[in-house]
């Protein structure tokens, strides 16, 4: 077996998104270094830390730096193997789109779900080996973030918080393995720790499935929980149409990498991709102000540079006052990404055509309108505005600007939204739009 094959086999043996990772997850559960009590605490702490990161954008540039290195590595691979490059980009969500399920990847490339996993695994093996042999990429961003000397618990907590904050649960295990390998952890260590990450994700994905959770595990929904969000809704004129009775998303609705929970309000099981989406569904299910809701109610078609794409907003909800809102889930800083702004424009148009309001729910205390109003130094904003007048800003130029100004990720997102700049990812490029 070649080194590439060993790398690919190790990557693949971290498991398949859910059920198929049972062996890796069970093995991880027997590891004496993380007890069941510590594992449960890790899941809770990661969720809380993820919410804090989603709210503040804390260390967001560090996560962007990681994706920038990955995008450069994938770009080199795509030059020789275009399909591999596209598959890795779609699986990890490097271009700002959400990570895709293996079922969806299989449909995209005309192969089975298992074959999509094999192709991804082979591609990652080739990419990691090439990066380690060439030494051309600065892998210190991984080594600094996931040091080899850290405890299992600390590494798992860090990875889970990042996954939750970036809404990337679908590819959480794959990202964990890849980040650890590039940080210098050996094959078996990376595989084992990725198994821990899978355990935690699978735990919150299946929490409350088929039945109501015990009262001590239910998340209380305050009576006024929806008040600030209803003020952020972009309302439509006219009478709202009825809610659909089934999800518009059908192709990968039952993919093993997705999560499920029982809804008391709907008296059935509901489905979601991420921890953030699960929080939204629980808020809808537990709020007395919400009469009914439907997950993935509509197919939204949008266009990115001539490429037609499809998106399914997280939910539509009818409130007790008769108003209806189409809701999408996007982490706060990510609302400024070009792909998400285009999706939001298309989603708003669709919602208003149905007489529904439109809301981007961020999982933080702030929404898009709050981000637009965020105060950033006028001097710093003018500095970036003047720099963009001379041409696009790439990652290297942005890093110099950040070092001289000290801005954080939410500052950048606020300036992008206010000035209608275009923020592309994978690789990063900031452009002034005429």
Whereabouts are the PLM-identified features?
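Short amphipathic alpha-helical boundary/capping segments
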Residues: 68-81
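DNA major-groove recognition helix of helix-turn-helix
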Residues: 120-127, 131
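Intrinsically disordered, low-complexity basic tails/linkers immediately adjacent to helix-turn-helix/homeobox/MYB/SANT
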Residues: 133-164, 433-434
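Extended alpha-helical scaffolding regions
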Residues: 158-222
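Electrostatic, structured charged patches in enzyme active sites and in nucleic-acid/phosphate-binding
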Residues: 193-434
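Short amphipathic alpha helix immediately N-terminal
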Residues: 79-99
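Helix-turn-helix DNA-binding module
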Residues: 95-112
């Amino acid at each position: 077996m070649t080194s590439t094959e060993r790398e690919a086999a190790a990557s693949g043996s971290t498991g398949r998104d859910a059920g198929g990772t049972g062996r890796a997850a069970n093995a991880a559960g027997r590891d004496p270094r993380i007890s069941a009590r510590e594992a449960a605490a890790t899941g809770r702490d990661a969720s809380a830390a993820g919410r804090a990161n989603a709210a503040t954008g804390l260390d967001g540039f560090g996560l962007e730096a990681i994706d920038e290195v990955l995008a450069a590595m994938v770009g080199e691979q795509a030059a020789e193997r275009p399909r591999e490059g596209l598959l890795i980009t779609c699986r990890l969500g490097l271009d700002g789109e959400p990570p895709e399920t293996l079922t969806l990847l299989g449909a995209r490339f005309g192969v089975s779900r298992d074959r999509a996993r094999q192709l991804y695994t082979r591609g990652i093996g080739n990419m990691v080996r090439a990066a380690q042999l060439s030494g051309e990429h600065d892998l210190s961003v991984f080594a600094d973030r996931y040091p080899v000397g850290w405890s299992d618990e600390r590494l798992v907590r860090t990875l889970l918080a990042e996954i939750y904050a970036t809404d990337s649960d679908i590819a959480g295990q794959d990202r964990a393995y890849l980040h650890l390998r590039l940080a210098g952890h050996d094959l078996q260590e990376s595989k084992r720790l990725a198994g821990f990450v899978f355990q935690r994700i699978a735990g919150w994905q299946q929490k409350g499935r088929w039945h109501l959770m015990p009262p001590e595990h239910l998340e209380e929904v305050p009576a006024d929980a929806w008040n600030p969000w209803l003020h952020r809704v972009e309302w439509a004129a006219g009478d709202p149409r009825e809610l659909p009775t089934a999800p518009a998303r059908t192709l990968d609705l039952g993919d093993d990498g997705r999560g499920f929970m029982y809804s008391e309000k709907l008296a059935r099981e509901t489905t979601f991709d991420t921890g953030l989406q699960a929080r939204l569904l629980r808020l809808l299910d537990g709020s007395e102000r919400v009469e009914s809701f439907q997950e993935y109610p509509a197919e939204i078609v949008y266009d990115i540079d001539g490429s037609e794409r499809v998106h399914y907003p997280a939910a539509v909800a009818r409130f007790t006052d008769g108003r209806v809102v189409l809701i999408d889930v996007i982490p706060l800083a990510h609302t400024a990404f070009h792909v998400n702004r285009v999706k939001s424009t298309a989603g708003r148009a669709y919602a208003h055509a149905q007489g529904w309001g439109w809301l981007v729910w961020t999982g933080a205390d702030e929404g898009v309108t709050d981000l637009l109003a965020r105060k950033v130094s006028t001097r710093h904003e003018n500095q970036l505005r003047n720099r963009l007048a001379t041409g696009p800003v790439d990652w290297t130029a942005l890093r110099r600007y950040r070092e001289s100004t000290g801005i954080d990720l939410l500052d950048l997102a606020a300036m992008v939204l206010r000035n209608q700049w275009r923020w592309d990812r994978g690789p990063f490029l900031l452009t002034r739009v005429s």
